[in-house]
């Protein structure tokens, strides 16, 4: 189903009445709310679940959910996870199995009763996490919708899945929640860069192949933060014969080189990524103003030294689609700086 929404978005997939039927036999309902655009739909869903099944425990997670605690609690949510929730949800399960509904001692959790418990620590060794049970998900239904990351594909069906090779990011851009994820914060230092081992990554990819996945979306916030490691992984992915997409944005400085003081693009790395199966790349240019990049985007890109146009042209020559991320509307951003961003985006569209 595709239902147009009042805000211009389109809701795809199960509608609220379908969800109510699906969850009828369950005691606990978990809902992710990561992005602002999901707020209204999630709020309506929580309200409806609470109305029809007031006895069910409703748990929310995600950056958007935790940033609007009062709103979602008023809608009917019981608990909201404040940080990475793989371990938190286990603790919630233990409480439920004990016959209690007192969750006030669990770290990284907020409750409608008013408690907000800071995240005491985050998992450092990602290999300790169990491998996602992809085979238990109704993947075929998602493949038939063919709308990964909200974008339509020309194919009638896309056999895809999402993975993460790492978590966190070494940069602290102001517009990203990671800039607030620091040691001793309420949410814990989930912004710290943590890496899965190569063997763990290959194990996950092999499992995805076994269940029929052909297109893998890599969700890392900083895929190339460790270039030597990334190249080693890409070399091992070549034989997998999969199509890959980096969707959250590759730091463009990582796609450039500096030899004898002269900057250039890392053609070898782009060619390796193409050989590994990359078909889509997202370039986070962020702004046409160097001042804005320096102030709000950790100075991660130098518009003069890093030749974005050359990167785009090289990627396209390797038959990779390129998308760009651009931001504007900062409190002290001038009209001229906004226009410079629009002009730069138009230039890149023509490259």
What are these model-predicted stretches?
Residues 132-322, 343:
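Radical SAM [4Fe-4S] cluster-binding motif and immediate context
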Residues 35, 223, 330-331:
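Short strand->helix junction
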Residues 31, 60, 246, 324-326:
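Structural beta-sheet core signal
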Residues 1-202:
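Acidic, low-complexity intrinsically disordered segments
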Residues 27, 78, 214-216, 279, ...:
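Short acidic/polar active-site loop segments enriched in Thr and Asp
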Residues 39-40, 69, 227-228, 335-336:
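Short N-terminal helix/helix-N-cap motif within the alpha/beta-hydrolase-1
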Residues 320-327, 348-350:
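Conserved beta-strand->loop/alpha-helix structural units within folded catalytic cores of enzymes
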């Amino acid at each position: 189903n595709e239902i147009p929404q009042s805000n211009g978005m389109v809701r795809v997939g199960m509608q609220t009445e379908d969800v109510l039927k699906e969850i009828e036999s369950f005691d606990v309902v978990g809902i992710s709310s990561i992005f602002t655009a999901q707020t209204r739909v999630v709020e309506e869903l929580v309200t409806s679940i609470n109305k029809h099944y007031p006895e069910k425990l409703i748990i929310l997670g995600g950056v958007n959910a935790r940033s609007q605690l009062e709103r979602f609690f008023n809608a009917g949510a019981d608990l909201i996870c404040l940080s990475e929730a793989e371990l938190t949800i286990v603790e919630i399960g233990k409480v439920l199995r004990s016959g209690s509904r007192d969750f006030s001692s669990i770290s990284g959790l907020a409750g409608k009763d008013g408690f907000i418990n800071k995240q005491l620590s985050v998992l450092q060794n990602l290999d300790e996490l169990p491998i996602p049970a992809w085979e238990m998900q109704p993947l075929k239904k998602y493949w038939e919708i063919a709308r990964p990351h909200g974008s339509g594909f020309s194919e009638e069906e896309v056999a895809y899945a999402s993975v993460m090779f790492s978590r966190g990011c070494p940069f602290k851009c102001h517009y990203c929640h990671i800039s607030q994820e620091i040691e001793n914060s309420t949410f814990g230092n989930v912004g710290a860069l943590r890496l899965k081992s190569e063997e763990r990554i290959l194990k996950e990819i092999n499992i995805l192949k076994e269940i029929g996945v052909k297109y893998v979306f890599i969700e890392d916030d900083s895929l190339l933060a460790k270039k030597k490691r990334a190249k080693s992984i890409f070399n091992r992915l070549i034989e997998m014969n999969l199509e890959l997409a980096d969707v959250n944005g590759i730091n463009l400085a990582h796609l450039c080189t500096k030899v004898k003081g002269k900057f250039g693009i890392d053609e070898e790395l782009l060619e390796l990524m193409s050989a590994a199966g990359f078909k889509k790349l997202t370039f986070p240019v962020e702004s046409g103003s160097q001042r804005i990049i320096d102030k709000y985007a950790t100075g991660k890109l130098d518009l003069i030294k890093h030749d974005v146009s050359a990167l785009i042209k090289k990627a396209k020559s390797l038959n990779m689609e390129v998308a760009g991320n651009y931001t504007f509307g900062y409190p002290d951003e001038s009209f001229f700086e906004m226009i410079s961003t629009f002009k730069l985006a138009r230039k890149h569209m023509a490259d």
